[in-house]
Amino acid sequence: MLKTSFLLSKRNAVSLSRVLATGISGRNVRHLTLQPSEHYDVAIVGGGIVGLATARELILRHPKLTFCVLEKEKELSMHQSGHNSGVIHCGIYYTPGSLKAKLCVQGLDLTYQYCDEHNIPYKKCGKLIVAVEDKEIPLLNNLYERGKKNGVKDLTMVDKRGIKEIEPHCEGMFAIVSPNTGIVDWAQVALAYGDDFRKGGGDIFTGYEVTDFKCASESGKSQEKEAGLTHPVTVFSNNKQTIKCRYVITCGGLYSDRLAEKSGCNREPRIVPFRGDYLVLKPEKCHLVKGNIYPVPDPNFPFLGVHFTPRMDGSVWLGPNAVLAFAREGYNLLDINLRDLADALAFRGLRQLMFKYFSFGVGEYYRGLNHAAQVKQLQKYIPSVTADDVVSGPSGVRAQALDRDGNLVDDFVFDGGVGEIGSRVLHVRNAPSPAATSSLAIARMVADKAAERFTL
């Protein structure tokens, strides 16, 4: 595993030393020192899968330029990239013509190709989207047509008998079969991106929480103005360290709106954290599930619904629910950050969403606290699953972008900035699922936008 960390230097209490493993295996550790005047052509903020994929793509395209990745945690992929279902999505759900649809379909092929080239294990276990009620059949048909419009490969429709041939324990009336949907450890993929970036000459700094961006001309310090002739942007950290660069790209995930605001962007769309709690099938019951089993999405509700997800380690995750997290990194019910919570509740868009889906939200909280209630939803698809067959599993936090009217922003969003720094910053504002599947395709788009916006 690629691990990086900052340590205080014995020679200088304000300088930081980076420990960077040169490969995923963790061998061949070398030590570098981050100087207060470190200079780069481009700094990428965010060491998750989108940030690392973007850094990799940029250094492949521009090997003569200097790049660094700045990550606030002690390790890479600590949040959404390391807390997800592990599904390689096919692209069936998304609005035809949207970036989500386009980049997911591209990303699926790129992901399998990348994993093959880098010997990263995956399983192409497929997915069933199952209609269990008459009213879901028209929705299933519409979803099938949407997948075709999006260019999703090899989709078929099967009846009850066909469902049983694929998933013997699953009940349903009709189902869409997506044979190319798969599973992978996305954290492992992200670390491989980071390793590619490092091998290309890039630097990765962890423990570097970005607190502000400024152009040299915005500062009263003549030294910064002089440095600004070639590297006008200063990136400040909570450790009082600075990095100077020509351009900045942010892939901040749960903090993307706050990072964008630092360059003068509108805070909207606002990021609101939603926690998803999973159950896990006991090992002796994992034979009940062979591949991914998903419900037909209900257009009356904002989230996908509970599903069955096999994992690379042989376990099976069930869920998740979707509830407001009380902290942007709130993986447990009692994780509370007063700033995050006040920020969310003060936002008109969240209040609108809560009002519109109040009963849905109450049900989600209840199912998160009551295994039997969650299992009851799952029994629609596999009736033989009981509450005794499951245990509490992990949780993840989703960075959901909302507009001020309470609508979920359903597509990827890119933004710049205003003022002197505006032309030197590019923000990935909204990159929810299927961002992991789409990561290599997103990286290509970000690199294209950077080439247009910046002088690289």
Curated annotation (Swiss-Prot):
GO terms for molecular function: 2-hydroxyglutarate dehydrogenase activity. Belongs to the L2HGDH family. InterPro entries: FAD-dep_OxRdtase, FAD/NAD-bd_sf. NCBIfam families: PRK11728.1. This is L-2-hydroxyglutarate dehydrogenase, mitochondrial. It catalyses: (S)-2-hydroxyglutarate + A = 2-oxoglutarate + AH2. Transmembrane segments: none annotated. It comes from Nematostella vectensis (Starlet sea anemone).
